[in-house]
Amino acid sequence: MNLSDITHPNQLHGLSNRQLEDIARQIREKHLQTIAASGGHLGPGLGVVELTIALYQTLDLDRDKVIWDVGHQAYPHKMLTGRYHRFHTLRQKDGIAGYLKRCESNFDHFGAGHASTSISAGLGMALARDAKGEDYKVVSIIGDGALTGGMALEAINHAGHLPHTNLMVVLNDNEMSISPNVGAISRYLNKVRLSDPVQFLSDNLEEQFKHLPFFGESLTPEMERVKEGMKRLAMPKVGAVIEELGFKYFGPIDGHNLEELISTFKQAHKAGGPVFVHVATVKGKGYELAEKDQVGYHAQSPFNLATGKAIPSNKPKPPSYSKVFAHTLTTLAQNDPKIIGITAAMATGTGLDKLHAKLPKQYIDVGIAEQHAVTLSAGLACEGMRPVVAIYSTFLQRAYDQVLHDVCIQNLPVFFCLDRAGIVGADGPTHQGLYDIAYLRCIPNLTIMAPKDEAELQRMVVTGINHTDGPIAMRYPRGSGVGVPLMEEGWEPVSIGKGEILRNGDDVLLVGYGTMVHQSLQVAEILKEHGIEATVVNARFVKPLDTELIVPLAQRIGKVVTLEEGCLMGGFGSAVAEALLDHDVVVPIKRFGVPDKLVDHAKPDESKADLGLTSPQIAEEIRQLFFNTPQPSAVS
């Protein structure tokens, strides 16, 4: 059977192992061709091809529900659930998403972008099923590091307390998240993977007993008891912890052996109650380069399939904000042993792998455990260390209470470095960094800043390290800087709560924040072509806002525009509007940012165009609003 003919996963039923292996081969080919052409997550999906096929071969997916953790594992799932012919549109505007979305397919039972959610969601569905008196299977597939997340462990704790609730948890154990897994749980699972000799010995004994003359076959039932005894003997090294938590444990099994997978899943479906199936896989399976470099090939930009090398862009790009941050922090840390970099399983993405390589004692990776990362940093700060929490904006959401309760209420000097702030592009709504300004600026004691470019980022890293009066956060975007000259060392801090004027004009005041400062300058140049002169301010800080600079300018010029790459509701523009009203300055103000809607996956420039946030669009709206039409009301 051709993969292209499969429109429903139930079509896998009745296929021979040889046919299923051929489907697996076709999935890998399509997966590799698509990611090589357009980019995306490569290694995770390649590792679960056989797991997906075997599981779906044992389920009735018109009834049964499968919940995937960390949706980038689910590319094979997408191909087997009617999206093969659209798979080439993966992560592109108006194409299929790189993660799971309930609105995209009836087979996507729960949306997933962040990690460690599948067991909680699956247990909720299983309890709902039982409450309604229905009868279908619920399977939660967790892996790619997600079992290191606290929520997953909370869900296991709850599920194990419900012996009559049928729920299957499948662990895709590839020893990785994005970087290698860390922590005691990971170390324990690695021991489990290494316990195969016990399984080999018991299987070998059974085979030898079968060949004994006269009564070999009759000993098979006894052999089963011997095998069970051996399993119990080995339990301290295998599934003892899982079984003590109330689950029936199966595994570890070879995640690339279809026959073994199908047999185990069939047994597990019959077990009843909470069941845990431990599947050992290889991240990047089937593509040698990805198997050898599982971190580098976790996700890829477009690349040459033969060589594995990224396809070079037409013109060289400036270094990324993440790279500049990593260099600056590492340089400062070399002269200050109190600086400790903390990541939650995102060392490569945040650049902290550079700090780890040079100063391993000044680096901590807590795994997918954002809440722990923040409170750990609070403890470090209590003892005089300078903790730097490098974390994606979207993931800090997961530790909001810890930021408020453990850091800000105690006014501890923790430095939060929020990577991927703003519009992130192809990862879509689960990963957009649009909300941090709004959810952080309402917290007392917290200072919040954003650099206009990569050179100012270097200065703000120094500012954050030097700021010992309380917590401070810096937000910065994904991708390349704007191309300004950089210093290797000797950076001067910026003054807390002070912005700067970059351009003077008497007709309209443009106040930009972070990435939108350079765009404000572009808008000013376009307006100049229409005879409109703008003052441009780089705010630098949303909290404390430089009211000594902004309020008099607004009062004098009389027309105010704010520009931010974040949500308008509660964002930077709201802060400026509040400040003007607090100072009894009532002037027309227009806020540009992201409205109250989700931003889907697309290239950042495509998303900005859809949102009316390109420089020509902003300039035209300003011209129409302030200079070609009657004056608007005070606040929009």
Curated annotation (Swiss-Prot):
Enumerate the catalysed reactions: D-glyceraldehyde 3-phosphate + pyruvate + H(+) = 1-deoxy-D-xylulose 5-phosphate + CO2
Binding of thiamine diphosphate occurs at 72, 113-115, 145-146, 174, 287, 370
PROSITE patterns per record? TRANSKETOLASE_1, TRANSKETOLASE_2
Q: How is this protein named in the record?
A: 1-deoxy-D-xylulose-5-phosphate synthase
Which cofactors are required for activity? Answer: Mg(2+); thiamine diphosphate
Tell me where on the tree of life, at the top rank, the source sits: Bacteria
According to its UniProt entry, this protein's organism is: Crocosphaera subtropica (strain ATCC 51142 / BH68) (Cyanothece sp. (strain ATCC 51142))
Which GO terms fall under biological process for this protein?
A: 1-deoxy-D-xylulose 5-phosphate biosynthetic process; isopentenyl diphosphate biosynthetic process, methylerythritol 4-phosphate pathway; terpenoid biosynthetic process; thiamine biosynthetic process
**Which Cys-Cys disulfides exist here?**
none
Give the function comment from the record. Answer: Catalyzes the acyloin condensation reaction between C atoms 2 and 3 of pyruvate and glyceraldehyde 3-phosphate to yield 1-deoxy-D-xylulose-5-phosphate (DXP).
Record's Pfam families? Answer: DXP_synthase_N, Transket_pyr, Transketolase_C
MF terms per GO, please? 1-deoxy-D-xylulose-5-phosphate synthase activity; magnesium ion binding; thiamine pyrophosphate binding
Give the encoding gene's name: dxs
